[in-house]
């Protein structure tokens, strides 16, 4: 392990979950494990037949939190939600390491799905077998479940769309 990379708090199938990203690294992605009425919300991209946790690339002017709020709305239609950070994750493939931020959310109010690349939002009791990223998503989901069991959402801040910089906790 490189000296400036924090020790992972969880490791599974090439995915490492860290408390923080190493100095000088930026989380390029925000992924959100979302609960609604006791189930997990997953999304299906219009070009795929598989399911995934909501999330996506961070815009250049966004924080990981702002990206998570935007992606949560764009991909699930969530208008009001509780949201907390679970940590950062790294994925190394082909010698390249990319970093992302993992969040846990509880959707309180959802509206219509905005026009986007998402074809379907569906509630699952557990992760389905047909995942878009089968080596990454289970590790992220396991970490989010651990945070959920520890009560992470109980005192998590309440957000509403749109989230602006002045609303960040």
Model-derived segments and their meaning:
Residues 1-31:
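Acidic, metal-coordinating catalytic segment for phosphate/diphosphate chemistry
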Residues 34-37, 105-107:
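Active-site beta-strand termini and strand-to-loop segments that position acidic
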Residues 35-74:
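Conserved Nudix-box catalytic region and its N-terminal flanking loop in Nudix hydrolases
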Residues 58-81, 89-142, 168:
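Unchanged
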Residues 131-169:
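Charged phosphate-binding loop/patch that engages nucleotide di/tri-phosphates or the phosphate backbone
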